[in-house]
């Protein structure tokens, strides 16, 4: 009898130790096709087409917490890409951290979403192709090796500050500072995310200083309807051009509505003429993405989307079209 009790207790120990650990993830893949045409005068200078089986951002993660008493908890997470196309490797290459949570809010250190990235619901698309999501306005979003503080919510308002150290920014790049806030009232919401970096090497022989970005998102989100608009401004001084001041403004909007198991969705983005890292590159664009999701269950959905992107106008425009179908399962 004693031996049976001892064996039962030993068998239960791993279960108890894992009680606050959660395994989660998403597996999603599909087929995408695209066609891009670069124009030179009245003729197409180049045409590129492609069709392939792609991973749409699969991930797997482990997270947990421990109650330390007096309302304080230790929290942790390790999350990684898990491409079923076999193109990703390594641990912790997505959001991974350790920290503390309590009445004061949440303090974490590790590879963390930037405050700007947490305003990224304006681009809800599951895609590999840049033409099947509003990815140009979303390009500055990142995960940073950093320390981040998130405040508790007061009357629907919460805030975040984040600091990425100089030695973690990579060669030729400085530390960066990030801040933002969220406000929710019923289904209505307002979000702001911004960042500042003293200097940054965009590429070889392209260096910028006093880079800053600001994004404001506002909209409505409930169980059936999601609608949002965003405006984003990037701004910097280009070192190689006598510290000339350069900027670009972008706007985007997304609308989705759930009808039973089907959720149709449409997004539009526009980039005004200008570029924060060049003086002679207009970088204006228009982009439209339409699509829908069909939920087989709470965890499994079918995806379909089509996209169009035009960069520039007139004789030197670049036009791309794309389409995709996929399947997503959450666990």
From Swiss-Prot:
One of its GO terms (molecular function) is porin activity. SUPFAM superfamilies: Porins. It is found in: Cell outer membrane. It comes from the Bacteria. Keywords: Cell outer membrane, Ion transport, Membrane, Porin, Signal, Transmembrane, Transmembrane beta strand, Transport. InterPro entries: Gram-neg_bact_OMP, Gram_neg_porin_domain, Porin_dom_sf, Porin_Gram-ve, Porin_Gram-ve_CS, Porin_Neis. GO terms for biological process: monoatomic ion transmembrane transport. GO terms for cellular component: cell outer membrane; pore complex. Its main location: membrane. Residues 1-19 form the signal peptide. It is a multi-pass membrane protein. Homotrimer. Belongs to the Gram-negative porin family. Serves as a slightly cation selective porin. This is Major outer membrane protein P.IB. It comes from Neisseria meningitidis serogroup B. The gene is porB.
